[in-house]
Amino acid sequence: MNSSPESTLEQASRLLAAAGSVAELDQVRVRYLGKKGEFTEQMKTLGTLSPEERKEFGQRVNQARDEFQRLLERRKAALEAEALARRLSSETIDVTLPGRGQRLGGLHPVTLTLRRITRLFRSVGFSVVEGPEIEDDFHNFEALNIPAHHPARAMHDTFYFSEHLLLRTHTSPVQIRVMESGQPPLRVIAPGRVYRCDSDLTHTPMFHQVEGFWVDEQVSFADLKGTLYEFLTGFFEKDCAVRFRPSYFPFTEPSAEVDIECVICDGRGCRVCKHSGWLEVMGCGMIHPRVFEAVGIDPERYSGFAFGLGVERLTMLRYGINDLRLFFENDLRFLRQFKPF
């Protein structure tokens, strides 16, 4: 190789200074320090020199190569600093801009319905009472005149922990507990979660109910009809037709199912009401004397009515929701439709 280590270093220094990026810098490094680089080739010539020349020339090559590496590292650090400065400059934050407000959430539609129901009943003098979700056999069945042979006690309808401990199948046990601890007049609703061994397109193992009752002297079926009519017209915000159909519940006598004129088609008939023009919304009746006897209230002196409704069903009717599973899938596209604004 004809060039000296010093001239090679001078040439390499100019190329290092001219490199505009780390990639170009790496090309210069390979040109001088690679397997076929110029400093590498100079070291290969040492074998052709005499011992005195070899020592002197080897020192010069090593010094030039070390200096090149020092210049290379310094130039690399400078290029990296410049690149970082450019990136930071492009990402500059304008601290004078207004901050982003937090996205407002909304309540679940079932929660909205529960609040609406409790607000309407409170407005006519009902108190709201909650009770335990794990109940005993007495409060969930026996005190409500549901005998041991009743189908509701079967394993396929009820979640049992033991022979006498279970997940409540309705919120009516709250009615029993309230009547055990107090004397009439009593006017109470009991909202909450209930559980049944049932899971299909229209049923879930856990759902929400609101059960209510009114116990006092001379409470009649007319009071029941008037209370539920006022509630339903207030809930749906329209003067809808209401009808009572005879039915059977162990804890009420007489008992009735409550239907309203379909709020979807206004009674003309549609898929939701199965083209009948009517929708079943709740069950009700006059409290059975045996229920009063179980809690120590004189059925000769006092009378009362009770009712129960499914919160999910009323929610679906109020908001026009046709799939029960939407309540439990946590799909934000669905839930954000119920934001207050």
UniProtKB/Swiss-Prot annotation:
Return the Pfam families for the record: Phe_tRNA-synt_N (PF02912), tRNA-synt_2d (PF01409)
Cofactors named for this entry: Mg(2+)
Cofactor binding note:
Binds 2 magnesium ions per tetramer.
Arranged from A to Z, the UniProt key words for this protein are:
Aminoacyl-tRNA synthetase, ATP-binding, Cytoplasm, Ligase, Magnesium, Metal-binding, Nucleotide-binding, Protein biosynthesis
Q: Which reaction does it catalyse?
A: tRNA(Phe) + L-phenylalanine + ATP = L-phenylalanyl-tRNA(Phe) + AMP + diphosphate + H(+)
Disulfide bond annotation, renumbered to this chain: none
Keyword Ligase found: yes
GO cellular component terms, semicolon-separated? cytoplasm
* Enzyme Commission (EC) number: 6.1.1.20
Its EC top class is ligase
The UniProt entry, under InterPro entries, shows: aa-tRNA-synth_II (IPR006195), aa-tRNA-synth_II/BPL/LPL (IPR045864), Phe-tRNA-synth_IIc_asu (IPR004529), Phe-tRNA_ligase_II_N (IPR004188), Phe_tRNA_ligase_alpha1_bac (IPR022911), Phenylalanyl-tRNA_Synthase (IPR002319), tRNA-bd_arm (IPR010978)
Question: What residues bind Mg(2+), as annotated?
Answer: E253
**Which Gene Ontology molecular function entries are recorded, alphabetically?**
ATP binding; magnesium ion binding; phenylalanine-tRNA ligase activity; tRNA binding
Q: Tell me where in or outside the cell this protein is found.
A: Cytoplasm
Give GO terms for biological process.
phenylalanyl-tRNA aminoacylation
Q: Which family, according to the similarity comment? A: Belongs to the class-II aminoacyl-tRNA synthetase family. Phe-tRNA synthetase alpha subunit type 1 subfamily.
Which NCBIfam families does this one have? pheS (TIGR00468)
| Oligomeric form and interacting partners | Tetramer of two alpha and two beta subunits.
Query: Mind telling me what this protein is named?
Result: Phenylalanine--tRNA ligase alpha subunit
Organism, per UniProt?
Methylococcus capsulatus (strain ATCC 33009 / NCIMB 11132 / Bath)
